[in-house]
Design a protein with these regions (language model features):
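Serine/threonine-rich low-complexity intrinsically disordered regions
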Residues: 1, 52-53, 144
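Feature marks short, highly hydrophobic, charge-poor N-terminal signal-anchor/signal peptide-like helices
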Residues: 1-7
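Transmembrane alpha-helical segments that form the membrane-embedded catalytic/substrate-channel core
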Residues: 10-22
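Active-site beta->alpha N-cap acidic-glycine motif
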Residues: 19-107, 111, 115-131, 136
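Histidine/lysine/aspartate-rich catalytic loop segments that bind and position anionic ligands
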Residues: 133, 138-146
């Protein structure tokens, strides 16, 4: 049992190393944006969080700055008010999958789609807005996500 776990972890580590050193394998998702030269995008992952999200929103409000929040579907439960607040304050919201599965790159195409759609549907139900942004967990994906 222990040897199986070690082998499995080594395979995962190898997968990430290959992705880092051979970017042309398209393991990392391509970023498509329309940022003008001299601008930056502020993004926040893994929310909403009862402690950190309000602090971030307060700072952004203080300086009249907008950001993009990539939310995890399972974190939205009991935090719907924060999702609504993010949206009402003019920030963008994107999906960061439902469960933030560490093995996301190894999931089937169907399971990946479900992870993304489930979160998109929850966010749309709360905000009324269609979700167009997606960030895979750990920034890593596979050929099924383009």
């Amino acid at each position: 049992m222990t040897i199986t776990i070690v082998i499995f972890l080594c395979i995962i580590l190898l997968y990430f190393i290959i992705g880092v050193f051979d970017i042309q394998k398209n393991i990392f998702v391509e970023s498509k944006n329309s940022v003008t030269k001299g601008q930056i995008c502020l993004t926040f992952d893994d929310g909403p969080d009862k402690i950190m999200t309000p602090k971030i929103l307060k700072i952004l409000n203080k300086y009249n700055i907008k950001g993009t929040f990539f939310l995890i579907g399972k974190n939205i439960k009991n935090n719907e008010d924060l999702v609504k607040k993010i949206s009402c304050e003019g920030h963008s919201i994107g999906s960061h999958t439902f469960s933030h599965e560490i093995l996301f790159p190894f999931l089937s195409k169907k399971k990946m789609f479900t992870e993304i759609k489930q979160t998109n549907d929850i966010i749309k139900k709360i905000t009324g807005k269609k979700i167009i942004h997606f960030r895979p967990p750990f920034g890593i994906t596979n050929i099924n996500i383009k």
